[in-house]
Structure formats: C-alpha cells, structure tokens
Amino acid sequence: MSDRLGGALARKPLHFIFVLDVSGSMLRGGRIQALNNAITEVLPHLRDEARANPHAELLVRVLAFANEAKWVIEDPTPVDRVHWQRLEAVPRGFTELGSALQTLAGALDDLDESHSAFPPAIILVSDGRPTQSTGVSFAEGLQTLLNNKWGATAVRLALGVGRDADMHSLRRFIGDEDVPLLRADNPEQLVEYIVWASKAASKVASRPVVGPGSGMGAPPPNAIGDPIWSTLG
C-alpha cells in the first residue's frame, strides 16, 4: 500500500509482549515444557499475522518471572527474527508478578510516542498466586502498569495454568469483563489457548474495535484432553 505521493506507507510498530511465569510450580506435570512448546508453535501464527497486516510491524518481547523478573527477549524484535530459546523453571521459585509488572511498565515508558504506535498486546501466563518476596505486591505492580499510558491502553490477555492459578488476579490484569479469561488444564489446552490469545491480541491491537470484548471473538472450547493439571494442582 502506498500514499498519494507514491511513497510506501510505513508500518506502525505493534509491541507484542509475553509475560511468562517460570516459578517452581511450573516444573509440575510438564508445564514448563508445554509452555515452551506453545511459544514455539505460536510464532509461525504470529508471522502469518504480521505478513497479512500491511499496517503493523509486529515486534516481540518476552519477560519471564519467578523470584525476579528477567527479560528473555528485551529488545523489540521483528517476529520473523525471533528464534525461541527454551525457558527453564526456577526450582522453588516464587511468583513475583507484581515486580514483573513494574519491570514491564518501565519498559513501556521507553516506547517512542512519535511513531504513533498501535497499543501494545500483552499476554500473561501464570499457574500460581502472586507472591511479594521482593516487597512489591501484585496490586502495586498492576497499578504501576495502569498508570503508564501504554500499559493502560494495551490489549491485555491472561491465561491461568492448572487449578492453583489465581484467576481473580488474572482477571484484574485483563481489566475488561468482556475479554475471555482462560485456564489450561493440560498441555493441549495450553498450546491452543496461547495460539488463540496471541492471534486475537495482535488483531485487536492493530485493528481497534469499539465495544464490549474488543471484537476478539470466542475462544476455543475447553473440552480438550484430560484435566491433568487440575488434578496435580
């Protein structure tokens, strides 16, 4: 697509950020392996979304958290250049989600407003209740994120893993009752839900729709496989 003067229209950046729980409980029942498989599988879908959208340049970042938040992919990276390095869960690691959200908010502060970027898309995956061994509560971290312009306008989706996932906190992170909150109870569900959430978030962020639910459509059915993670906790 080009403008009237014959110059190509520049793609606007769409920052796509995964916030991933790598706490000790992710070692149970093959959860961390399933999470790695899910991210590996979702990347080709995101590349397809990027190729199909002439208006957005999809830039990926990944933030992992356990006892502390650490960037796995810190620099905004075009999706076709992302090569996934498998995550390792932290044995006996806590779930410092509040600290992770503060780290995320700090990164969003650095976005260049001159580019008129699309709202960021943020997908949070966690299997536990937020801890605060760093002294930062979930509520404090979330408020820091929402006080940030980009954090407040971001398309925020969340996915719980297993029965111990704190769905109340994940719902607060989403902030919109019309946006589906999903819980995966086995590896198959985790892959399918992350693929759905990633495709939905990238579409909504780059093609804003006014109205309840942000126009992202219905999630996949939850009757996939046996609920092994709800049995394990």
Which residue ranges define each predicted feature?
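Acidic, low-complexity intrinsically disordered regions
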Residues: 1-233
